[in-house]
Amino acid sequence: STVTQGTNRTTGVTINAVSGAITLVSAAGSATAASFTVTNSAVAATDVIILNQKSGTDKYDLLVTAVAAGSFEITFRTTGGTTTEQPVINFAVIKAVAA
C-alpha cells in the first residue's frame, strides 16, 4: 500500500496495511524535527514499527515516537540537507505482544 501526504510535512496520513510506503509532501528538507501521525487500523499498541528511507536526495533521521492502537507517529529531520523533494518512507508493522 502507498499513500501521499498532503498540505505540509506535519499532515497526518491514513494507510491501513502492515507494510507500505509514505510519500512526503514536496518541501525543502530541514534539520529541525517534525512529526506526523500515521493512522493505521492494522497497528496495535504493542506492535513494533520499522522505518527506512526508500528515496530522496537528502538523508533523513527517522524515528517512531509513539505507537497506539490504530496509529503511530513518525518524527523526522534531515542530517543537514535542504533539497526540495518528496522522499518516500517505507514502513513495516511487526506484530508483537508485551512480555
Regions of interest found by a model, annotated:
Residues 1-47, 54, 60, 66-99:
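Extracellular receptor-binding modules and their adjoining Ser/Thr/Gly/Asp/Asn-rich linkers
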